[in-house]
Amino acid sequence: MNSVAPTTPIPNPLQSQSGFAVPPGALEAEIDELITHYPQKRSASLMVLHAIQEHFGWISQEAVEWSAHKLGLQPINIYELVTFYPMFRASPVGKYQIKVCRTLSCALGGSHALHKHFCEKLGLDAHAHGLQTTKDGKFTVEFVECLAGCGTAPVMMCNDDFTKA
């Protein structure tokens, strides 16, 4: 018995109540082109996530589901990447992202005081876990794992700019 695929297209989860919508062809065309550089679609997963985050500023659950569908994977496969790699954001962040290293070298070099200083200046809770964003949406502060500058601790990043003491 021959089965016929449904003719109803799968809805694009980026077009949802969260306000996400792929620009007509622009982002999807970029992603389609990225995928062609890899022997298997799944191998493009990180690059697809980078493209989505660069466009939207973060990776929503809808984007996870859309990416999984696009790459022929299960959403959990994409979610694992989003939650494993510290460069990906699963929630909205401020225009300015301040990341302070909290690993041993930086902690001994004063990263906790640096983090506390930023939080106090921006009206955030210095003792809260995870990332925090100011009410105006301008700044996000978070403790992160090693930023690979142990010899010049403490280190931090503001957006993509690496800063050391």
Role assignments for model-derived ranges:
Residues 1-165:
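Signature of N-terminal electron-transfer/Fe-S-associated modules in redox systems
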